[in-house]
Amino acid sequence: MERTFAIIKPDAVERRLAGTVIDRIEANGFTIVGMKKIKLSKEQAGGFYCVHRERPFFGELCDFMSRSPVIVLCLEKENAIADWRKLMGATNPANAEPGTIRRDFALSLSENSAHGSDAPETAAFEIAYFFNALELV
């Protein structure tokens, strides 16, 4: 079994779409092994997105991710990373396939409703950033 990390972003939580996204996650065979609702500070968002620190959108990204609560999840299944990325859809919702989370719920490229790890190493870092071992079942 493989684990991946997911975030239901502020734009989706604000519009009360978290339950719908969680339903889709479970309907697609994922086991939720960790989940919590949190309010990130700008500093916490910056630490999480540290790989983007030099990118021009970094400040805006940290502002967005800290403006209201998010749902962080650790998901498990065979091929979890690839399958979650497929279910999310392309980063740009205009390019996402119909039926994906971003195509169905995103407001824009920056407010795209969901985040997912892109590799096993990234998943390990992201899961550990938000969960300790006792919080994962």
Curated annotation (Swiss-Prot):
GO terms for biological process: CTP biosynthetic process; GTP biosynthetic process; UTP biosynthetic process. It catalyses: a 2'-deoxyribonucleoside 5'-diphosphate + ATP = a 2'-deoxyribonucleoside 5'-triphosphate + ADP; a ribonucleoside 5'-diphosphate + ATP = a ribonucleoside 5'-triphosphate + ADP. Signal peptide: none annotated. ATP binds at K9, F57, R85, T91, R102, N112. It comes from the Bacteria. The keyword Transport does not apply. Gene3D superfamilies: Nucleoside diphosphate kinase-like domain. GO terms for cellular component: cytoplasm. The active site is at H115 (pros-phosphohistidine intermediate). GO terms for molecular function: ATP binding; metal ion binding; nucleoside diphosphate kinase activity. The keyword Nucleotide-binding applies. Homotetramer. Major role in the synthesis of nucleoside triphosphates other than ATP. The ATP gamma phosphate is transferred to the NDP beta phosphate via a ping-pong mechanism, using a phosphorylated active-site intermediate. This is Nucleoside diphosphate kinase. It comes from Pelobacter propionicus (strain DSM 2379 / NBRC 103807 / OttBd1). The lineage of its organism: Bacteria, Pseudomonadati, Thermodesulfobacteriota, Desulfuromonadia, Desulfuromonadales.
